[in-house]
Amino acid sequence: MENASILIVDDEKAIVDMIKRVLEKEGYRNILDAASAEEAIPVVKANKVDLIVLDVMMGGMSGFEACTLIREYSDAPIFFLTARSSDADKLSGFAVGADDYITKPFNPLELAARIRAHLKRTYQSKETSSNQTYTYDYFTFSPQNAELIVGGEAVACSAQLLQLLQYFCEHPNVVLSKDQIYEKVWGYPSYGDNNTVMVHIRKLREKIERDPSNPEYIVTVRGLGYRFIPNPEGKRS
């Protein structure tokens, strides 16, 4: 995990240097940095980046715009770093493809812990992925190959959404709370952060459901959480 490539994108050099120092103390050696979103795009194109820490408010292209472009080349987890902390801002960030949201001012040790937890979860998911392919009426999912086929066509999906889908597939017909999903998929306590789970489930529904507004596979259990139904309405794969 210490061999992971981490890209830090922020126009404040002091913040970049602080994050790099903390990550280096944690044992990470492959740390890249960029001073702008425009500078970050070619770095992502030229390197296999495992995780990106991306500032939202920078001169020129914003982090939101950069995230959308990065998603064309990479499914690496993206942690937004920003002073904008409203729920609306967080929802906007998750909507464009972010995986986590760190509010300034922040504790660099907490950021390092979140990065480690996320990378650990990603590597564990890859190591434990079996050869099993989950085949349902409308989509097929291969965790080992990170491949999602919906309606006969390959669908691009971020690593975080694939981990979320894998967790649901591994727990069919079980009611899962938002806190439970967050802790298992993101790798650390949710502290009541339900928006993260809700937005990612909405995005996952947009990928796998025939009608995301009337989901068949990932259904809401009011007051409790969500249930994954592998064969809606008695359908058999």
Curated annotation (Swiss-Prot):
It is found in: Cytoplasm. It comes from Bacillus subtilis (strain 168). The keyword DNA-binding applies. It comes from the Bacteria. SUPFAM superfamilies: C-terminal effector domain of the bipartite response regulators, CheY-like. Member of the two-component regulatory system YvrG/YvrH that positively regulates 7 transcriptional units (wprA, wapA-yxxG, dltABCDE, sunA, sunT-bdbA-yolJ-bdbB, sigO-rsoA, and sigX-rsiX), and negatively regulates the lytABC operon. The modification 4-aspartylphosphate is found at D55. GO terms for molecular function: phosphorelay response regulator activity; transcription cis-regulatory region binding. Residues 5-119 form the Response regulatory domain. Residues 131-230 bind DNA. This is Transcriptional regulatory protein YvrH. It holds the Pfam family Response_reg.
